[in-house]
């Protein structure tokens, strides 16, 4: 079994940069480990255009192409429904 790995993406929050980071570093995340995408809240704060769709758009696109990751609602909703700056940003590798 591979080591437990945590990758955190907290870059520019631009859609393109976030998607590139997800694609480049997701292979390092072992089964049962996490890839956290920071600051998806920019969409909720009305800054989606500034960030070309931002982290949430990148996450949605990444998940469509990578069914080995899921959004882990346990962490997204720990304090209430998406009560986090990392909206839909806790990605768990399931296989």
Where are these regions (language model features)?
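A short acidic, Gly/Pro-enriched loop at the edge of an enzyme's catalytic core
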Residues: 1-7
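Switch II (G3) loop of P-loop NTPases
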Residues: 10-13
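C-terminal substrate-binding/active-site "lid" region of AdoMet-derived donor-dependent transferases
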Residues: 5, 15-95
């Amino acid at each position: 079994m591979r080591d437990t790995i945590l990758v955190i993406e907290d870059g520019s929050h631009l859609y393109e940069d976030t998607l590139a980071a997800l694609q480049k570093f997701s292979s390092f995340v072992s089964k049962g480990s996490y890839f956290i995408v920071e600051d998806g809240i920019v969409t909720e704060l009305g800054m989606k255009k500034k960030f070309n769709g931002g982290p949430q758009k990148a996450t949605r696109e990444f998940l469509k192409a990578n069914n080995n990751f899921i959004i882990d609602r346990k962490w997204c909703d720990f304090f209430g429904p998406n009560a986090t700056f990392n909206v839909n940003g806790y990605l768990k590798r399931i296989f």
